[in-house]
Amino acid sequence: MDAVTVYHGKISREMGEKLLLATGLDGSYLLRDSESVPGVYCLCVLYQGYIYTYRVSQTETGSWSAETAPGVHKRFFRKVKNLISAFQKPDQGIVTPLQYPVEKSSARSPQAPTGRRDSDICLKAP
């Protein structure tokens, strides 16, 4: 996971929100460890001043998947970078396409958050 440039590791939800809100760009995104579910990650996306959080996890067979909007077919990927590439396209079951990566090395000093909305959808490995 450390090879994924948007992976920020064990940062808090609040810190992730600050990093995204500091960009001010809809479609900004990052990946962080889930604070509530061990072994699960959160794909956090900025859209219209709110942060949407989608849970990402790895199955026992090594495939990666993200829980998306109800009714959207669940897709599995060999690598996290493939999952991210798929969600850069429109109509993939998340609020907006992933457009602006917030890389760990380029994280700036964040501003205070103005709002938050968690989809907080959880996907656990079977």
Swiss-Prot record:
A biological process term (GO) from this entry: natural killer cell activation
Extent of Basic and acidic residues compositional bias: 115-126
Main location per the UniProt record: cytoplasm
Domain of life: Eukaryota
Pfam families found in the cross-reference section: SH2
InterPro entries recorded: SH2, SH2_dom_sf, SH2_prot_1A, SH2D1A_SH2
Subunit structure: Interacts with CD84, CD244, LY9, SLAMF1 and FYN. Interacts with NTRK1, NTRK2 and NTRK3.
Function of the protein: Cytoplasmic adapter regulating receptors of the signaling lymphocytic activation molecule (SLAM) family such as SLAMF1, CD244, LY9, CD84, SLAMF6 and SLAMF7. In SLAM signaling seems to cooperate with SH2D1B/EAT-2. Initially it has been proposed that association with SLAMF1 prevents SLAMF1 binding to inhibitory effectors including INPP5D/SHIP1 and PTPN11/SHP-2. However, by simultaneous interactions, recruits FYN which subsequently phosphorylates and activates SLAMF1. Positively regulates CD244/2B4- and CD84-mediated natural killer (NK) cell functions.
Protein name, entry field: SH2 domain-containing protein 1A
